A protein has these predicted regions:
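Noncatalytic scaffold domains of N-terminal-nucleophile
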Residues: 26-50, 54, 62-63, 67-251, ...
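Active-site rim segments in enzyme catalytic domains, especially the processed small/beta chain
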Residues: 76-82, 88-102, 107, 116, ...
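Extended C-terminal subregions enriched in glycine
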Residues: 432, 478, 511-512, 520-581
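Alpha-helical support elements that line or immediately flank enzyme active sites
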Residues: 55-56, 150-158, 251-258, 263, ...
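Bacterial N-terminal signal peptides
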Residues: 7-19
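Internal maturation/activation junctions in enzymes
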Residues: 209, 241, 262, 274, ...
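Short loop/turn motifs at secondary-structure junctions and domain boundaries
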Residues: 284-285, 416-421, 479-480
Length: 613
């Protein structure tokens, strides 16, 4: 009876955590810390995290639950992420090393730099036609190979215990119909002028030609059928006396990437002005790679590699280790200034050096070294904000690259409804202290729906550039450098924390602040995500028309007027964002190996969710 009651209470917590902050449930937070001993799931929507909790209750581990949460989110969080997108994943199983699932699809083989530079008008509709060599922000030309399914299958096969059918069951049920919420209705309404140009997208998201009403049962029948076909392929291959789980998973993968689904998507995209073909699907495989690592004051902070922006957090932590941040005081003018200036330096290196390591040579060891950080640290002027973009010269171990060309500041000219729509997050800790952190993204509204497959196609190719001197220049079969950046932390080699967030280029800025809130200032996970934040846009944007806003600093008003005034006096171009105005919205789970209790925080800025068992 006790266990049944506890489960019910935890499920109720999903919905309690769902609303905007209206009352104080802790001395310093709007929401309570969510704690459990058998497992915790945190993510972006209550039905998504319930899917993961369901798998934990059925004996699955953190990987099984994380994959179930991702797949459920790919159905119901389509405003920010869906099945045709991408998802980098960090995993730490008991007794094993930290690994990263490189869940980022490649550019189509027809996606050459010359194609985008030379075309006057692309095959996309007029609203998404980009001139001047820019890659469209949405439409058929912006898609890379969908990576979600292969990343999930790879994680299950090598680190999970469940079948795809088991972890995909909640997603299929949700595709059959779920009560649509306010956020999804808003995105359908505001993005309909773009996606209505693609008949299948209009058919799916405007049933009967109308925007759904909040609470309507929203059905994705084509997607449900596709998911069932994939599961059927798994079941047929795994039948027999040995009940071969691996064979079933590989059959499911092949059905999507080498079988009828790939052919149908490829045919549709080719017929509608896109570049992706069935052969691009067949060439893709999500690799299991090694993460990069920062050692910061006894904590080991793991990030995905240089095909993401994750190493920028490592660079930033290496620089900040030379400062007494506690003495500065949390969110004091000197604290915010120091973090912002360190981030500017790290992001300048990102823009200058990061890209797909399969295609470009990157001075990885030097960029991540403490010696390089020591060279860069003195560039942080404690009294003045930098307005210059200053990449370093790690190959020659010099603080500044002498030949660096300054990027001209420019604001985005794209209409709001055409801009990138962001991301979600998934974090899981199970009863054994296994850790799972993922940042699912892509294939958000407005998106092309690939015919009768029901699969929304991604827009990540826009993160590639056409500058031939950039390590992130577009090329056939090359991955765009992405902003998606899950985080996994050990303390003295023991499991300690997982955290991830939406927020585009600002993801690592938010995660840095949450991480330091815990490590430097001893905050609990809910305090850490609710504390006032800031971000700078002093970088070349990874999206849209790649704006650059030198010296910009967005600050939530809760830091206080005096702090805002002092930051302005230092030369920051401060924009006050309101009390809860920054773009990011992390979830974080902290694990205590001494008693097996996991504690979660979920950001109220975008109604993140956490549940415990």
């Amino acid at each position: 009876m006790y266990i049944r009651t506890l489960i019910v209470l935890c499920l109720v917590t999903v919905f309690v955590l769902g609303g905007l902050p209206v009352s104080t449930t802790h001395a310093d937070t709007f929401r309570p810390v969510v704690r459990g001993k058998r497992g915790v799931v945190a993510g972006g929507q209550p039905l998504s995290v319930e899917a993961g909790l369901r798998i934990l209750q059925r004996g699955g581990n953190a990987v099984d639950a994380g994959v179930a949460t991702i797949l459920a989110a790919s159905v119901i969080e389509f405003s920010h992420f869906s099945f045709g997108g991408e998802v980098p994943i960090l995993i730490k199983l008991k007794g094993q090393k930290v690994v990263v699932i490189e869940g980022m699809g490649q550019a189509p083989m027809k996606a050459t730099r010359e194609f985008f530079v030379n075309r006057a008008h692309g095959g996309a509709p007029s609203l998404t036609t980009r001139k001047g060599g820019l890659i469209p922000s949405t439409g058929p030309l912006s898609a890379t190979v969908p990576a979600v399914l292969d990343a999930c299958i790879t994680a299950l096969d090598q680190f999970g215990t469940k079948t795809l059918a088991e972890v995909m069951e909640p997603a299929i049920q949700l595709a059959d119909g779920f009560p649509i919420d306010e956020l999804r209705v808003q995105y359908i309404r505001t993005r309909s002028p773009i996606f209505s140009q693609w008949p299948d997208a209009k058919r799916v998201f405007l049933p009967g030609g109308e925007v759904p009403k909040v609470g309507d049962i929203f059905v994705q029948a084509d997607l449900a059928r596709t998911l069932r076909e994939i599961v059927r392929a798994e079941r047929l291959a795994s039948k027999g006396p040995r009940n071969n789980r691996h064979a079933g998973l590989m059959a499911a993968r092949d059905y999507f990437y080498r079988g009828p689904i790939a052919r149908r998507i490829g045919d549709y995209m080719q017929a509608n002005g896109g570049l992706i073909a069935a052969g691009d699907f067949a060439r893709f495989a999500a690799k299991v790679g090694q993460p990069v690592q920062a050692d910061y004051r006894g904590y080991q902070v793991y990030k995905a590699g240089f095909w993401t922006q994750g190493p920028a957090l490592v660079e930033t932590l290496n620089m900040l280790e030379g400062f007494d941040l506690k003495k500065m005081g949390h969110n004091s003018p000197s604290y915010i200034h120091t973090l912002a200036e360190a981030l500017k330096l790290a992001l300048a290196d990102r823009d200058r050096y990061y890209g797909d390591p399969d295609f470009v040579k990157i001075p990885m060891t030097e960029l991540l070294s403490k010696n390089y950080a020591a060279l860069r640290r003195p560039l942080i002027d404690e009294s003045r904000a930098s307005l210059a973009q200053q990449p370093g010269d790690p190959s020659n171990m010099k603080a500044v690259l002498a030949s660096a060309v300054q990027t001209i500041g420019r604001a985005s000219a794209l209409p709001e409804i055409e801009r990138a729509n962001d991301t979600t997050c998934v974090n899981v800790v199970d009863k054994d202290g296994n850790l799972f952190s993922a940042t699912p993204s892509g294939a958000w509204l407005p998106a092309v729906v690939a015919g009768d497959t029901g699969v929304l196609m991604g827009q990540r190719l826009q993160s590639s550039l056409t500058d031939p001197n950039s390590p992130n220049v577009v090329a056939p079969g090359k991955r765009p450098r992405i902003t998606l950046t899950p985080t996994l932390v050990l303390k003295g080699g023991e499991p300690f924390m997982v955290l991830s967030t939406p927020g585009g280029d600002n993801q690592d800025q938010a995660l840095l602040q949450v991480l330091l809130n815990v490590i430097e200032f001893g905050m609990n996970p809910q305090e850490a995500v609710e504390a006032p934040r800031f971000d700078t846009q002093h970088y070349v944007s990874s999206f849209d028309d790649h704006e650059f806003l030198p010296g910009s600093l967005n600050v939530e008003s809760r830091v206080g007027l005096k702090t805002i005034e002092e930051l302005s006096l230092k030369g920051h171009k401060v924009k006050v964002q309101g009390e809860w105005g920054t773009l990011s919205a992390p979830t974080v789970i902290i694990y205590d190996p001494s008693n097996g209790v996991a504690s979660a925080g979920a950001d109220p800025r975008r109604s993140r969710y956490a549940v415990a068992w």
